Design a protein with these regions (language model features):
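Signature of N6-adenine DNA methyltransferases within the class I
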Residues: 22-23, 27-36, 57-64, 79, ...
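Polybasic, glycine- and aromatic-enriched phosphate-binding surface used to engage nucleic acids
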Residues: 299-483, 489, 493-502
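Glycine-rich, acidic and aromatic/proline-enriched surface loops and short helix-turn segments
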Residues: 7, 149-152, 442
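Catalytic micro-motifs at enzyme active sites that drive phosphoryl/nucleotidyl and oxygen chemistry
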Residues: 71-72, 107, 131-137, 228-235, ...
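Class I S-adenosyl-L-methionine
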Residues: 1-78, 83-102, 127, 203, ...
């Protein structure tokens, strides 16, 4: 059935390409991706009938994949009710032809009756017009299985589509998110929905409302990640632009299953990762997703997550640098003048060492505003935004107050974060600062943060939650690193890995 739909769709693509020079291939789901999406749906082999929704059906490739799987794996199922929404006139004839051929194949090969409904309408705006009348009320049609690879166009905030879906706050929103919101409303209790969404759905701050609404209505159950090529072996593996999310209408599972592939989802190249706790993958506050991309990633996350301490429990805090250049015009100087204090910029962070002064401009600030200066204390500095040339995601350096003994106060630039004591009157001990730096400069912590980070920069909120070993272990590592008098990643790894019982490859 799936082969039939894909073969016929290929003919349509070739015809349009020749006659109208329209390239439609990118609009349709690849065969292996369709089979993968259908496989992510849970099926009950004892069930005798299924209702299926394919919203934005195109030529029926996803419909074919679901119907084929039900027929093959559910011998008790004798009836399938398929509903398709499609309003593209180029696709409708092929959709109807494919479904009719599939109907005959179901009857002939599997003795299954396939009942077909095709709505030549916009799913987002018109689905509310199709409902079931009950004794007490009329409710919108609901389905046991929903599968959807939506179109990619953008809708304005005041468009009819955004209005029907509701809860849209951004100026523009992609159609896939509106399709997902509508699909969540059309799920029966215990139903499953598998939807292709842009990878931005996992963490984009503008989609917080979307994720929270989905979290309230349905529970995430499975995730498939399409992995891109890794240009820098020392940086995190990149995601391609789409991910597949599988939702269920019911209680959240204890574990979420994540799988990955480098292609369109062929079985031989798909890797299933060890299941992860639901509360780890799905953030309780904003619904954002943490997405490990390999078995090694899941091992690192599982190991680090069990450490007992955080910055707060150690009496520490992470803050963003105080100075933004555009707000301090007239206060910044390239050379030291009377009343000015050093301004530590991200260029000072180099190879684990904080170097000052540097051959850069505007590295001193006049101490005229108390909100722009801080006490000269031991700190760990972190680049907020890694440069493309950086080999690591997390770039940190150790700063000792004794480096600038003639200054009681210094300042920090907004493009760095700094770790300091919560108590303004106290100071981090040298061994604690060096131990913390050893952890942050190690390979395993760089990997961990690149896995759990939901943005391309170091987020102080994520750093506050960073699991850390007990204080005595951190201080012990700090003393050993101080004795080694080195700040390289290799030196930190030589101390951190044996201490934390991490076995290197």
């Amino acid at each position: 059935m799936l082969n039939l739909a894909v073969r016929n769709t290929g003919k349509l693509v070739r015809e349009k390409s020749k006659s109208e020079n329209i390239r439609l291939g990118r609009l349709f789901t690849k065969k292996e991706t369709a089979r993968l999406m259908a496989a992510m749906l849970r099926l009950d082999t004892e069930r005798t009938a299924y209702t299926v929704l394919d919203a934005g059906a195109g030529t029926g490739i996803l419909s074919a994949a679901v119907i084929e799987r039900i027929c093959r794996e559910c011998p008790s199922c004798k009836q399938i009710f398929i509903t398709c929404y499609e309003n593209n006139e180029d696709f409708l004839p092929m959709l109807k032809d494919n479904l009719e051929r599939i109907r005959k194949k179901c009857r002939h090969d599997y003795n299954v009756r396939l009942y077909i409904t095709v709505y030549e309408e916009n799913y987002i705006t018109e689905s509310k017009n199709h409902y079931t009348v009950t004794f007490f009320d009329s409710v919108e049609d609901k389905y046991d299985l929903i599968i959807c690879n939506p179109p990619t166009e953008l809708y304005e905030k005041d468009s009819q589509e955004a209005s029907e879906a509701g809860g849209v706050t951004q100026v523009k929103i992609g159609a896939p998110f509106l399709f997902a919101k509508m699909a969540a409303r059309h799920m029966e209790d215990g139903a499953d929905a598998v939807i292709m969404l842009p990878a931005t759905a996992a963490s984009a701050s503008s989609l917080t409302g979307f994720r929270q609404e989905m979290k309230e209505r349905v529970s995430l159950e499975r995730i498939h990640l399409f992995i891109g090529k890794q240009k820098n072996a020392k940086r995190a593996v990149p995601l391609k632009k789409n991910i597949i999310l599988s939702y269920t209408k019911g209680a959240a599972p204890e574990k979420i299953q994540i799988s990955t592939s480098y292609d369109e989802g062929k079985p031989e190249s798909t890797v299933a990762l060890p299941p992860l706790d639901y509360n780890f993958v799905v953030d309780e506050a904003d619904g954002s997703l943490t997405l490990p991309k390999s078995i090694e990633d899941t091992k690192i996350v599982s190991y680090i997550s069990h450490f007992p301490e955080t910055l707060s429990s150690l009496g520490l805090k992470i803050s963003t640098g105080l100075v933004i250049d555009s707000r301090c015009e007239g206060l910044l100087f390239s050379e030291p003048i009377k009343g000015a204090v050093p301004l530590l910029r991200q260029s000072c962070i180099n190879g684990g060492v904080t170097t000052f002064p540097m051959p850069v401009k505007r590295q001193y600030i006049a101490a005229v505003n108390p909100t722009l200066i801080q006490k000269n204390k031991n700190m760990v500095l972190i680049k907020r935004v890694p440069a493309k040339s950086d080999e690591r995601f997390l770039n940190s350096s150790i700063y000792m107050a004794a480096q600038l003994p003639s200054y009681r106060y210094i300042s920090t630039h907004n493009k760095i974060n700094f770790i300091d004591t919560k108590d303004k009157l106290s100071e981090m001990s040298a061994r604690l600062a060096w131990g913390l730096f050893a952890l942050l400069n190690s390979t395993i912590y760089d990997r961990y943060l690149s896995i759990v980070s939901k943005s391309k920069q170091i987020n102080s909120k994520e750093m506050k939650k960073l699991p850390l070993p007990p204080r005595n272990i951190i201080e012990n590592m700090g003393m050993r690193l101080m004795a080694a008098k080195q700040t390289t990643v290799a030196a930190c790894d030589q101390i951190v890995n044996p201490t934390l019982h991490i076995i290197e490859k």
